[in-house]
């Protein structure tokens, strides 16, 4: 074989080997890429951002409060009726308390004592000794912002069972008003005692009792008509609702008529009610004002007598009444501990002014600071005299109501 031929053969063999090597390299690279395809062809995963939970704000203590005003008896005598008569034969008592409405309408809770039964005109309007008042009395007080009414008095049964039933039916038409002291059945009484009222995040119960009945007892088996006080009844009533509410408010018709002094029975009942967990006791019946007091290490605030709010008992002592303000305050701590207290008591005196024309007319309720000498001579002297009575057991009492501002 010639050398030229051998060289050609070697070149050809070299080309073949070169091609084989190239193919081997390509194949190896392809195999490597296939095996590691995830590394080359898979998009890198984006890092998922973890959602940051909002930081919880530290728990803060909370405070709730409801401002309450209390006034005394709506004791409606002939003079008050006659002054309120309208040409159409009806009654309008609103002008008589219009000035005080500017104060009472500013409060969360506004209380008064309805001394005379609202039996309505159909039973005959009457005055002392057996009272019966038209529904328009209630209308006037509701219009002035009053939304808590005590009905248990020594005059509840003045018109018998029908008088009470008429009164109960009237107040049923005003569910926005908390009433206590008269009911038409035992079931209604129980529901009323255990009813939970609420204002501004504060819950409260309201119960009314009287220790007097003027010898006019309820019919046998119908004690619910007038809420007469016994220690046993009060204990059962209060225990049935105490743990359901922040505050228990009790209205007591008690004390000695026309006496500025608190008697032993009032003190005894007040201390007993306080031991049951009552926070606020509001008194009526004496028809004159008495002192106020914080008892049981501040657990219970007692207003022994608010006196008359409106009447025709023609004497300065009876024309003078007490308007009392307190704040029901609830504090909820960060550990949910709840503390409730009756705080910031404030007081003002009110007076029933009249125009005398052989009899009293033009009845108006105004506060003592607004009195003139024409309306009451020596009103400044009376003011200091009556303030001293109220201050007897609470000497640091603040005078002047928030609602007067």
Each PLM stretch: what is its role?
Residues 2, 16-18, 24-405:
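Acidic, metal/ion-coordinating pockets
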Residues 1-13:
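N-terminal Lys/Arg-rich, disordered targeting/topogenic segments
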């Amino acid at each position: 074989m010639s050398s030229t031929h051998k060289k050609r053969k070697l070149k050809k063999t070299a080309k073949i080997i070169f091609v084989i090597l190239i193919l081997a390299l390509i194949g190896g690279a392809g195999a490597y890429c296939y095996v590691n395809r995830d590394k080359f062809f898979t998009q890198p995963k984006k890092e998922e951002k973890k959602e940051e939970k909002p930081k919880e704000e530290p728990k803060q203590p909370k405070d709730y409060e409801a401002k309450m005003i209390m006034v005394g008896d709506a004791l409606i005598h002939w003079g008050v009726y006659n002054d309120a008569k309208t040409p159409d034969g009806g009654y309008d008592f609103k002008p008589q308390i219009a000035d005080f409405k500017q104060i009472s309408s500013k409060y969360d809770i506004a209380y008064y004592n309805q001394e005379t039964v609202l039996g309505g005109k159909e039973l005959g309007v009457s005055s002392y000794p057996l009272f019966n008042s038209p529904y328009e009395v209630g209308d006037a007080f509701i219009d002035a912002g009053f939304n808590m009414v005590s009905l248990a008095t020594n005059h509840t049964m003045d018109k018998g069972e029908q008088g009470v039933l008429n009164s109960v039916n009237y107040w049923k038409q005003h569910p926005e008003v908390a009433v206590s002291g008269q009911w038409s059945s035992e079931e209604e009484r129980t529901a009323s005692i255990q009813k939970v009222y609420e204002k501004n995040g504060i819950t409260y119960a309201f119960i009314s009792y009287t220790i007097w009945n003027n010898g006019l007892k309820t019919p046998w088996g119908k004690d619910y008509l007038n809420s007469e006080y016994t220690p046993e009844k009060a204990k059962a009533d209060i225990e049935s609702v105490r743990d359901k509410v922040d505050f228990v408010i009790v209205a007591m018709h008690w004390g000695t008529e026309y006496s500025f002094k608190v008697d032993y029975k009032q003190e005894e009942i007040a201390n007993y009610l306080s031991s049951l967990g009552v926070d606020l006791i509001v008194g009526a019946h004496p028809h004159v004002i008495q002192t106020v007091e914080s008892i049981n290490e501040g657990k219970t605030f007692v207003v022994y007598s608010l006196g008359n709010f409106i009447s025709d008992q023609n004497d300065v002592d009876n024309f003078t009444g007490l308007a009392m303000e307190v704040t029901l305050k609830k504090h909820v701590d960060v550990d949910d501990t709840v503390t409730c207290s009756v705080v910031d008591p404030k007081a003002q005196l009110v007076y029933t002014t009249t125009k005398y024309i052989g009899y009293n007319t033009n009845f108006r309720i105004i506060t003592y600071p607004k009195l003139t000498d024409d309306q009451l001579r020596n009103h400044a002297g009376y003011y200091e005299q009556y303030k001293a009575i109220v201050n007897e057991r609470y000497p640091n009492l603040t005078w002047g109501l928030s609602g007067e501002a």
